[in-house]
Amino acid sequence: MRTLWIVAVCLIGVEGNLLQFGRMIFRMTAKNPLSSYSNYGCYCGWGGKGKPQDATDRCCFVHDCCYEKVNDCNPKTATYSYSFENGGIVCGDRDPCKRAVCECDRVAATCFRDNLNTYDKKYRKYPPSQCTGTEQC
Protein backbone atom coordinates (compact mmCIF):
# COMPACT_ATOMS: atom_id res chain seq x y z
CA MET A 1 0.00 0.00 0.00
CA ARG A 2 2.84 2.38 0.83
CA THR A 3 4.39 1.76 -2.58
CA LEU A 4 1.05 2.49 -4.24
CA TRP A 5 0.87 5.85 -2.40
CA ILE A 6 4.41 6.79 -3.50
CA VAL A 7 3.71 5.76 -7.10
CA ALA A 8 0.47 7.77 -7.08
CA VAL A 9 2.30 10.84 -5.82
CA CYS A 10 4.84 10.47 -8.61
CA LEU A 11 2.13 10.08 -11.24
CA ILE A 12 0.19 13.10 -10.02
CA GLY A 13 3.32 15.20 -10.05
CA VAL A 14 6.17 15.59 -7.65
CA GLU A 15 5.10 18.08 -5.06
CA GLY A 16 7.39 18.62 -2.10
CA ASN A 17 4.99 18.66 0.77
CA LEU A 18 2.28 16.46 -0.73
CA LEU A 19 3.89 13.38 0.79
CA GLN A 20 4.36 15.17 4.11
CA PHE A 21 0.72 16.26 4.14
CA GLY A 22 -0.33 12.71 3.27
CA ARG A 23 1.64 11.34 6.21
CA MET A 24 -0.03 13.84 8.52
CA ILE A 25 -3.46 12.84 7.25
CA PHE A 26 -2.75 9.13 7.66
CA ARG A 27 -1.34 9.57 11.16
CA MET A 28 -4.32 11.66 12.29
CA THR A 29 -7.12 9.67 10.60
CA ALA A 30 -5.72 6.20 9.77
CA LYS A 31 -7.28 6.74 6.31
CA ASN A 32 -5.45 6.48 3.01
CA PRO A 33 -5.02 10.14 2.04
CA LEU A 34 -5.14 9.46 -1.69
CA SER A 35 -8.33 7.41 -1.82
CA SER A 36 -10.12 9.18 1.03
CA TYR A 37 -9.26 12.84 0.55
CA SER A 38 -7.79 13.53 -2.90
CA ASN A 39 -11.15 13.84 -4.68
CA TYR A 40 -13.71 14.44 -1.93
CA GLY A 41 -16.51 17.00 -2.11
CA CYS A 42 -15.91 20.30 -3.85
CA TYR A 43 -12.54 21.27 -2.34
CA CYS A 44 -10.48 18.19 -1.48
CA GLY A 45 -8.02 17.74 -4.32
CA TRP A 46 -6.83 20.14 -7.00
CA GLY A 47 -8.88 23.28 -7.44
CA GLY A 48 -12.21 23.88 -5.84
CA LYS A 49 -15.43 25.79 -6.35
CA GLY A 50 -18.90 26.11 -4.92
CA LYS A 51 -19.87 25.55 -1.31
CA PRO A 52 -18.23 22.88 0.85
CA GLN A 53 -20.52 19.86 1.11
CA ASP A 54 -19.78 18.85 4.71
CA ALA A 55 -17.33 19.40 7.55
CA THR A 56 -14.57 17.38 5.85
CA ASP A 57 -14.95 19.33 2.63
CA ARG A 58 -14.84 22.53 4.71
CA CYS A 59 -11.47 21.37 6.11
CA CYS A 60 -10.21 21.33 2.51
CA PHE A 61 -11.77 24.71 1.77
CA VAL A 62 -10.02 26.25 4.79
CA HIS A 63 -6.77 24.54 3.72
CA ASP A 64 -7.06 26.07 0.23
CA CYS A 65 -7.66 29.50 1.79
CA CYS A 66 -4.68 29.02 4.08
CA TYR A 67 -2.42 28.22 1.12
CA GLU A 68 -3.63 31.39 -0.63
CA LYS A 69 -2.30 33.44 2.30
CA VAL A 70 1.20 31.90 2.23
CA ASN A 71 3.80 34.35 0.91
CA ASP A 72 7.37 33.96 -0.30
CA CYS A 73 7.20 30.27 -1.21
CA ASN A 74 5.05 27.79 -3.08
CA PRO A 75 2.97 25.87 -0.53
CA LYS A 76 2.68 22.86 -2.83
CA THR A 77 6.43 22.40 -3.14
CA ALA A 78 7.82 23.76 0.14
CA THR A 79 9.14 21.02 2.41
CA TYR A 80 9.12 21.58 6.16
CA SER A 81 9.98 19.91 9.44
CA TYR A 82 7.37 18.58 11.84
CA SER A 83 6.87 15.88 14.44
CA PHE A 84 4.04 13.96 16.05
CA GLU A 85 3.77 14.58 19.78
CA ASN A 86 1.06 13.54 22.24
CA GLY A 87 -1.45 12.79 19.50
CA GLY A 88 -0.88 16.05 17.68
CA ILE A 89 1.37 17.58 15.04
CA VAL A 90 4.07 20.09 15.92
CA CYS A 91 5.54 22.26 13.16
CA GLY A 92 9.21 22.89 13.77
CA ASP A 93 10.57 24.86 10.84
CA ARG A 94 12.09 28.26 11.58
CA ASP A 95 11.61 29.54 8.05
CA PRO A 96 8.39 31.62 8.24
CA CYS A 97 7.06 30.46 4.88
CA LYS A 98 7.71 26.77 5.48
CA ARG A 99 6.25 27.05 8.97
CA ALA A 100 3.10 28.67 7.52
CA VAL A 101 2.71 25.81 5.03
CA CYS A 102 3.19 23.26 7.80
CA GLU A 103 0.57 25.03 9.91
CA CYS A 104 -1.91 24.93 7.01
CA ASP A 105 -1.34 21.19 6.65
CA ARG A 106 -1.43 20.59 10.43
CA VAL A 107 -4.75 22.38 10.80
CA ALA A 108 -6.27 20.44 7.88
CA ALA A 109 -5.07 17.03 9.08
CA THR A 110 -6.37 17.80 12.58
CA CYS A 111 -9.66 18.98 11.09
CA PHE A 112 -10.00 15.69 9.19
CA ARG A 113 -9.46 13.78 12.43
CA ASP A 114 -11.95 15.93 14.32
CA ASN A 115 -14.60 15.33 11.64
CA LEU A 116 -14.16 11.60 11.03
CA ASN A 117 -17.63 10.97 12.44
CA THR A 118 -19.24 12.99 9.63
CA TYR A 119 -17.04 11.71 6.76
CA ASP A 120 -19.42 10.49 4.06
CA LYS A 121 -18.28 8.19 1.24
CA LYS A 122 -20.96 9.67 -1.03
CA TYR A 123 -18.69 12.71 -1.43
CA ARG A 124 -15.79 10.66 -2.85
CA LYS A 125 -15.39 11.42 -6.55
CA TYR A 126 -18.06 14.07 -6.18
CA PRO A 127 -18.97 15.56 -9.58
CA PRO A 128 -17.74 19.17 -9.97
CA SER A 129 -21.03 19.98 -11.70
CA GLN A 130 -22.70 19.63 -8.29
CA CYS A 131 -20.42 22.26 -6.77
CA THR A 132 -22.51 25.40 -7.02
CA GLY A 133 -22.75 28.66 -5.15
CA THR A 134 -19.84 30.66 -3.85
CA GLU A 135 -17.81 30.72 -0.67
CA GLN A 136 -15.30 33.39 0.30
CA CYS A 137 -12.09 32.75 2.19
Swiss-Prot record:
It holds the Pfam family Phospholip_A2_1. The keyword Electron transport does not apply. GO terms for molecular function: calcium ion binding; calcium-dependent phospholipase A2 activity; phospholipid binding; toxin activity. Keywords: Disulfide bond, Hydrolase, Lipid degradation, Lipid metabolism, Metal-binding, Secreted, Signal, Toxin. Its main location: secreted. Residues 1-16 form the signal peptide. InterPro entries: PLipase_A2, PLipase_A2_Asp_AS, PLipase_A2_dom, PLipase_A2_dom_sf, PLipase_A2_His_AS. Expressed by the venom gland. One of its GO terms (cellular component) is extracellular region. Disulfide bonds join 42-131, 44-60, 59-111, 65-137, 66-104, 73-97, 91-102. Its EC number is 3.1.1.4. Binds 1 Ca(2+) ion. It catalyses: a 1,2-diacyl-sn-glycero-3-phosphocholine + H2O = a 1-acyl-sn-glycero-3-phosphocholine + a fatty acid + H(+). Exhibits high hydrolytic activities and shows strong preference for the anionic micelles (dPPC with deoxycholate) to the zwitterionic micelles (dPPC with Triton X-100). PLA2 catalyzes the calcium-dependent hydrolysis of the 2-acyl groups in 3-sn-phosphoglycerides. This is Basic phospholipase A2 Drk-b2.
